């Protein structure tokens, strides 16, 4: 009758924009930018009387000699390879291995036969059955979860997760998104009907994280503001809670869609509540590509102007951009470079369009005979499983390489940082020391060693922070992501050391 479990979040296959490998490379330490949410969420569903241990492999080695009788492994497609390695290793050691999470939910056949038990979909409604079967020695090969009522969700077991080396915690306030972007895999297993936790639940989770010393939290929603009435009620509760904190305010990040820019009152409330930065899927200035992908919420607006509204409200936008749509021709790289240069957005997540397994895009590309089924999306930012329509694969990769070198050039990045600062209002609630944190300062020193351009850019950045101490957290975060991006480009052999362009030299001389 097994009653001990080891829950693992595996290491990613390779560096990514918002991961933290650069911290190890700069000899700062091994810890994630954001703490894992899946492992403490699953831990909260384990019955009383069980022994529970959590491992986030981004911060510690997996204990292959654990005494736990059951091993549970979660993960996304980017963790696919490591999920399989760990499942095989623990089965060889006689452990009962469960596998679940987004990747298994979307592509269960990929882990079938490798793990003993597959948990497909959301675990909450089937957790009691799973653990009862395990205790009885009668675990099934597969369990399928439904769409649970999040108002019944237990508080994650953050007490089992060490926050000492994590920069931010997570609270999931909802699941699902009503939009239907054809490349989005989230809605394929979480659904298009958004489900929410009550504000009191969210505050309870924030209280727990605050007591553990956390002062930065990702509100891990697929679209935080899409249901305005619900978002307002929650933000009002968070604002009231945050004003009562006596050992520093909590700051927040989340994901929202560009249509939030049409609601300045909501954005103002978000900033007062403590929202600091937000991820937005901008994708492309190519309207035909937006139509093709059913990204309707980005149509019929001036995207750069809408991003400007979000900055003017006091938020740092983290903009997701994509090339490789069927309507993208060879000119898309210059179009994207010009568009991105116009944004007051230091943080750009630039990627090639990939068709995730289980999405409408995957089905369409497969039906058209343009799907590379050998590629699964876990390796390289210039890789894709889609054979493009209007250019060769070689042209797409070469164009992407030029594009990332342009937008992440240190001077071009600095221009976007300064555009962000110029467009940002003064926020007295964010006033602090006019200097970077210790981690940011050590990353800056590591970046400066790359060359004269980086050194000069950092001098301008430090001067900017002295002028605008209210922006230190946002600019500091931008610096962390920029350093991680440069590390990632080095890892993939994509960074080109080039002489400055005339435009860059003009900035240098300004």
What is each stretch, according to the model?
Residues 63, 68-72, 234-241, 329-346, ...:
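Short, electropositive alpha-helical surface patch
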């Amino acid at each position: 009758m097994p009653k001990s479990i080891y829950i693992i979040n595996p290491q990613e296959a390779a560096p990514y924009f918002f991961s933290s490998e650069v911290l190890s490379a700069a000899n700062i330490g091994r810890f994630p930018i954001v703490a894992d949410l899946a492992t403490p969420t699953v831990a909260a569903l384990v019955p009383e009387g069980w022994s529970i241990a959590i491992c986030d492999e981004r911060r510690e080695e997996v204990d292959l000699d654990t005494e736990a009788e059951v091993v549970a492994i979660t993960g996304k497609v980017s963790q696919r390879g490591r999920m399989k390695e760990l499942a095989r290793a623990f089965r060889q050691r006689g452990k009962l291995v469960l596998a679940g999470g987004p990747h298994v939910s979307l592509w269960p056949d990929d882990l079938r036969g490798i793990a003993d038990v597959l948990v497909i979909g959301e675990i909450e409604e089937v957790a009691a059955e799973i653990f009862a079967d395990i205790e009885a020695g009668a675990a099934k090969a597969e369990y399928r979860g439904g769409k649970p009522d999040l108002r019944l969700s237990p508080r994650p077991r953050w007490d089992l997760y060490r926050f000492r080396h994590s920069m931010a915690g997570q609270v999931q306030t909802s699941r699902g998104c009503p939009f239907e972007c054809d490349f989005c895999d989230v809605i394929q297993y979480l659904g298009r009907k958004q489900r929410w936790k009550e504000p009191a639940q969210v505050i309870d989770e924030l209280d727990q994280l605050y007591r553990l010393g956390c002062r930065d939290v990702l509100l891990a929603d697929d679209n935080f503001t899409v249901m305005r009435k619900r978002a307002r009620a929650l933000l009002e509760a968070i604002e009231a809670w945050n004003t009562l904190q006596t050992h520093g305010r909590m700051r927040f990040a989340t994901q929202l869609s560009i249509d939030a820019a049409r609601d300045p009152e909501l954005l103002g409330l978000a900033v007062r509540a403590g929202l600091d930065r937000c991820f937005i899927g901008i994708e492309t200035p190519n309207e035909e590509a937006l139509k093709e992908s059913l990204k309707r919420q980005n149509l019929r607006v001036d995207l750069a102007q809408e991003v400007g509204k979000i900055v003017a409200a006091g938020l740092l936008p983290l903009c997701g951009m994509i090339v490789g749509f069927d309507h993208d021709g060879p000119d898309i790289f210059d179009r994207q470079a010009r568009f991105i240069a116009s944004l007051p957005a230091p943080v750009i997540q630039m990627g090639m369009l990939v068709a995730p397994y289980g999405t409408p895009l995957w089905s369409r590309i497969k039906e058209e005979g343009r799907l590379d089924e050998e590629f699964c999306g876990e390796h390289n930012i210039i890789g894709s499983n889609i054979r493009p329509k209007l250019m060769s694969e070689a042209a797409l990769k070469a164009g992407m390489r030029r594009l990332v070198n342009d937008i992440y050039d240190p001077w071009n990045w600095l221009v976007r940082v300064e555009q962000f600062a110029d467009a940002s209002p003064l926020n007295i609630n964010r006033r602090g020391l006019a200097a970077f944190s210790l981690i940011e300062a050590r990353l800056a020193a590591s970046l400066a060693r790359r060359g004269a351009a980086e050194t000069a850019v950092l001098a301008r950045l430090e001067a900017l922070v002295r002028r605008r101490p209210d922006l230190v957290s946002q600019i500091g975060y931008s610096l962390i992501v920029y350093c991680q991006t440069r590390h990632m480009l080095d890892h993939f052999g994509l960074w080109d050391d080039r002489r400055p362009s005339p435009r860059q030299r003009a900035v240098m001389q300004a």
